Curated annotation (Swiss-Prot):
It holds the Pfam family Hydrolase. Optimum pH is 5.0-7.0. It comes from Escherichia coli (strain K12). Mg(2+) binds at D6, D166. Belongs to the HAD-like hydrolase superfamily. YihX family. Its EC number is 3.1.3.10. This is Alpha-D-glucose 1-phosphate phosphatase YihX. The active site is at D6. Transmembrane segments: none annotated. Optimum temperature is 40 degrees Celsius. Signal peptide: none annotated.
Amino acid sequence: MLYIFDLGNVIVDIDFNRVLGAWSDLTRIPLASLKKSFHMGEAFHQHERGEISDEAFAEALCHEMALPLSYEQFSHGWQAVFVALRPEVIAIMHKLREQGHRVVVLSNTNRLHTTFWPEEYPEIRDAADHIYLSQDLGMRKPEARIYQHVLQAEGFSPSDTVFFDDNADNIEGANQLGITSILVKDKTTIPDYFAKVLC
């Protein structure tokens, strides 16, 4: 079997309120105001596909949100999104590999974040056979082509694949291809799913 794990709020807890909090501290703009103006628009998607640079993304978002931040200040806040690793998921990934399954990570991410989390959480790379990142592939979830790329690269059919993600749109995109897709609602979803399988 091929098991595909998303990264944020699946393997690692993330919280965009921490990003906004850091920017609020730096700019003195109230957090409530930043929450209203923050949305994951086209610049966000372009950045995740690697179509625009980190600097262009920072400039676009600062413009959209009227943030008077330097690139360094923007980056500092952007890295604050990461909270903590989910060790129970890392343990499951290792167990699956020990049983002969293929385990990969598929994440919509960007270069700003990949300068941080691989060093901060080396356990992720150790637990996965391969890591697929949207910025490297030039495509992002829930686009069908990104799932098809992973299936083809790994040599698995949709019927022999299980996908875990915390985003309902991403789950729907994978479901449409016939991939068994599990919406991760909280920290118990993945351990509960494997409770009987990995006894």
